Amino acid sequence: MELNSIKPGSGSKHAKRRVGRGIGSGLGKTAGRGHKGQKSRAGGYHKVGFEGGQMPLQRRLPKRGFKSHLLKFNAEITLGQLQVLAVDEVDLLLLKQIGLVGELAKVVKVVKSGELTRAVVLKGIGATAGAKAAIEAAGGSLAA
């Protein structure tokens, strides 16, 4: 066997369907589109969501709520993530450098999820009531 004699396995490749190339091909004349009607014409079909003139679903349903753009400035970390960190004093700048919070984050809060067994001092970082109790129980504190 030579490299120039390698061919795909039989049946693994299919020829591209060429429509409108004579009646002998089986896909000539109307090219598989049937006779007349909107879908047989050039220029495509109706828009996505169009319901034939009936009021479309996305306009029948009321608007509801919104997505706050302030969310990108808030971040949260867990007690489990604090446990993994190899530092004793944690502040916002450190969390950004490590990549635990995004660059846009301005407010960070610790939530009670996971275990914390070592003392950690948080500077300028908030905590939920449960997380605060767990941090203080481990010998840590929250500094303003």
Curated annotation (Swiss-Prot):
Keywords: Ribonucleoprotein, Ribosomal protein, RNA-binding, rRNA-binding. Residues 21-31 have a biased composition (Gly residues). Part of the 50S ribosomal subunit. GO terms for molecular function: rRNA binding; structural constituent of ribosome. HAMAP family: Ribosomal_uL15 (MF_01341). It holds the Pfam family Ribosomal_L27A. Binds to the 23S rRNA. InterPro entries: Ribosomal_uL15, Ribosomal_uL15/eL18, Ribosomal_uL15/eL18_sf, Ribosomal_uL15_bac-type. The keyword Ribonucleoprotein applies. Belongs to the universal ribosomal protein uL15 family. It comes from Leptothrix cholodnii (strain ATCC 51168 / LMG 8142 / SP-6) (Leptothrix discophora (strain SP-6)). This is Large ribosomal subunit protein uL15. Residues 1-51 are annotated as: Disordered. GO terms for cellular component: cytosolic large ribosomal subunit.
